[in-house]
Amino acid sequence: MKTFTATPETVTRDWFVVDADGKTLGRIATEIAIRLRGKHKPEYTPHVDTGDYIIVVNAEKVTVTGNKAKGKTYYSHSGFPGGIKQISFEKLQAQKPEMIIEKAVKGMLPKGPLGRAMFRKLKVYAGAEHNHTAQQPQVLDI
């Protein structure tokens, strides 16, 4: 019997919507990363993007455990000397709550062109509304 290998033409992608209200950041991010890669499918192939589209709503209501709300720090660098910036979880949640889930999921995806293609299938919204109703997403309970 020949081993099955998925090709981009044979991959079928579904749309799922995930509600992050009251969910723990790491636990929801790992499940999203698995679904974006397509590892939940029997036709998973490591070198082909077999994952689904994921819409995350209520990103502003995601939680972290322990003292991470105050102690967790996100860093970015401009590329210039002395250009490092840091922001705490609490401030980032108030300013750009979508970025918290995006950074957590992006770190769990492969680095390179395939990982960037997988990351493009993630749509994160701070509130409960999203503009992907035409795709008829299914509710994914995590």
Swiss-Prot record:
One example of a Gene Ontology biological process annotation: negative regulation of translation
Record bears the keyword Ribosomal protein: yes
Classification via Gene3D superfamilies: Ribosomal protein L13 (3.90.1180.10)
Molecular functions per Gene Ontology: mRNA binding; structural constituent of ribosome
PROSITE patterns for this protein: RIBOSOMAL_L13
A Gene Ontology cellular-component term: cytosolic large ribosomal subunit
Keyword terms: Ribonucleoprotein, Ribosomal protein
Domain of life: Bacteria
InterPro entries recorded: Ribosomal_uL13, Ribosomal_uL13_bac-type, Ribosomal_uL13_CS, Ribosomal_uL13_sf
NCBIfam families: rplM_bact
Known role: This protein is one of the early assembly proteins of the 50S ribosomal subunit, although it is not seen to bind rRNA by itself. It is important during the early stages of 50S assembly.
Family, as annotated: Belongs to the universal ribosomal protein uL13 family.
Assembly: Part of the 50S ribosomal subunit.
Stated name of the protein: Large ribosomal subunit protein uL13
Originating gene: rplM
